[in-house]
Amino acid sequence: MSLNLTAAGLADQKAWEAAGYALPSYDREAMITRTKESPCWVHFGAGNIFRAFQANTAQELLNNGTFDRGVIVAEGFDTEIIRDMYQPHDNLSILVTLKADGSVEKTVVGSIAESLAADTADSPDFARLKEIFTKDSLQMATFTITEKGYSLKNGAGELLPSVAADFAAGPSSVTSYMGKAASLLYERFLAGEKPVAMVSTDNCSHNGEKLSLALTAYASAWEENKLVQPGFLSYLQNPEKVSFPWTVIDKITPRPDGSIEKILEEDGLADAQPIITSRHTYVAPFVNAEECQYLVVEDHFPNGRPPMKKSGWIFTDRETVNKTERMKVCTCLNPLHTALAVFGCLLDYELISEEMKNPVLKKLVERIGYIEGLPVVTDPGILSPKQFIDEVLNIRIPNPFMPDTPQRIATDTSQKLSIRFGETIKSYLASPELSLSDLQAIPAVFAGWLRYLMGMDDNGDAFDLSPDPLLATVRPYVQDLKLGAPADREALSKTLAPLLSDASIFGVDLIFAGLSDRVLNAFVSMLQGPGAVADTLAALTAQF
């Protein structure tokens, strides 16, 4: 039996259902016709997170009859995804939901009505996008293009060449991603200043602000260079015309996994293999993702919005969106991930999920979340912080089907310690009721990071450090230390003082805060010899 992921292949409904696939329960051809005639929702970024989350929520609305149109997807970075994966499969995709109990759910997602290359070199597709952006029916354009997609400058603060070229050329011949989006908004402006919501759903802080600043930079440059009609910048800056809601998204969607590919091939799925595009995107006819997901959205849509609330999106005000982000980043998810990443690298783990089988590491992250973090958590009111941690520690991180690695999460740790742990320390310092003496696990993570920077695991074997922009700055503090050599604590204290007092890394001056001794004690303990990291953590958690 062969299952073909095409519109014609879905006609063999019994074969798909016999293999355990949930199929679209709506008239897909009618949906496609309606969506093309009266498009409501365009999404930029055709990658895995879109197919696993946004496209599936559109399908839920279609399945339960609360909405009659799907989503149009446009890809402006790697258009091979559209040509080589979307269109050969008639814009169908398979969502494989990976559950913590080891089971999988398989869903054929059919809500994508049209897929387009957001590329001015592909004139028919870009002309179609321009047409869509002039439609009265268009309510929102959402984005998952990664945080880098909103960047207009390089690390030196200079405009990227493509951005500078677009600023000078105007909206008719854009090549940068944000330039394309600005060009399409200009079409909407020319069509009568029609309202629309531009919604970043990328996993970055204040994402709506990032999108707004990027697009208004184009409008400002184009007006200044007299490349657009007067009023375009004012149109973008009028929230009753164009809004930029802030959002918080939370769903882990790794690249296509070989074990999932094998399951689907055993079902009879034809052409299940992933492809790697010339831009190094891994894409397959399927996406594998965890079951847990959140999308909290600032409810500001000047032209209305689809009934996304009925598919699990949480609509609220900007302050609550911000609180949700702080809850997640400062307490309930990200600090736990970083702790496991650092010690996972030191203790030779290859999967985050495997670490949760270690009772010492499990106890450590439970202490960070429940005991040290929850007393100062920002409670958004729409989600329970304790329930969020419960889900993270009992369902999400232990999920054996989620191929997430400590090495991936350890990337850029120097940029993460401040927000993930420093904010908690600041809250303790500011509170008359709380005592810094209760912080035991967080200083151990800092000590673990110092030990990690040595590039030597707990067996004494070398390993490659994950990429980090400050490695050249911070590694020299520890690179000459040796395992098992007696450490002169006083000399070490002086050597490390400039690092431990660096509030840009830790969020606070650890010496001034009175936490440096705790960090040093744990670090010296971890230097005693092979196995010292595990021994230090075991002794520490035995006191919890």
Outline where the language-model segments fall.
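Substrate/ligand-engaging "lid" and interaction regions
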Residues: 1-44, 48-544
